[in-house]
Amino acid sequence: MKFAIVVNVTRQNALDLARNLALWLDERKVAYIFESLSAEKLQTDNSAPIEELNKHCDAFISLGGDGTLLFTSHYAVTKPVIGVNVGYLGFLTEFTQAEMFTAIERVLNGSNTIHTRSQLDATVLIDNEVQHLRALNDVVIEKGAYPRIPTFIIKLDGELLSSYRADGIIIATSTGSTAYSMSAGGPIIAPKSSVFVITPICPHMLTVRPIVISDEKIIEVSVDAPDGSFPLNCDGNLKKMLDPQESITVRKSTVAINLVANENRDYCEILRTKLLWGREHNFGTIDS
């Protein structure tokens, strides 16, 4: 068994944890390799470019927050990912720093379980070539710096759903429902639900609401505007500036992400903990 390790190099505590992890693995004679930027910060030559890690390892370890895990998952493809939370919220990162070594031991002895998460596949023309872009959380088309409110045209399986005057459109998986979509007013969806959610960003009409659809649907989105260019983001990464009337097609990807599960956590507990549900808030009093 060989691990590929990806570290959020902007966090000193993540780098410190990576050093401790390397020592722990060395003591047990377990093979590992760092992603190149992580290795540079840790001053080790045991590294490979992120694009090549998949062919050098059997599993990935992500040391950071949800953003680091999203980044790692794109290169892990179907190989298992152990997400260790060294960030803030940590919806996707299953393990605390204190739980990291136990999680790795379970992977080593084959006693771990896997959470399989669906992804989105966005088909778009880039440099005159059809490209397939994967996203674990969401695909987002925004108005960007466009000075007016554009109209987003959405079709489901070729049939017109509606046209939205809005600042953007979020298409999210159940995994991504607690990310940007939730901030824009979208519903929270349990992880194993076979659905997607389409969430408008700041729609011009109050009657416009997010819609939950089957993940078997094929979604087509285009921007109706006389000019301008519109950012297409997959999991927060800019992939292309869309032209007016240019369409993208979003469907369920044939590739799923495999996250190593923390059997000591359940989804309801995560929601209560991360979103502070059921807690009394003391905002203080105003002196008269």
Swiss-Prot record:
Binding, NAD(+): 66-67, 137-138, 148, 165, 167, 178-183, 237
EC nos: 2.7.1.23
Annotated TM spans: none
Keywords of this entry: ATP-binding, Cytoplasm, Kinase, NAD, NADP, Nucleotide-binding, Transferase
GO cellular component, as recorded: cytoplasm
Any one Gene Ontology molecular-function term assigned to this protein's record: NAD binding
Subcellular location: Cytoplasm
Cofactor: a divalent metal cation
Pfam families in UniProt: NAD_kinase, NAD_kinase_C
Family: Belongs to the NAD kinase family.
Protein name: NAD kinase
Name of the gene encoding the protein in the UniProt record: nadK
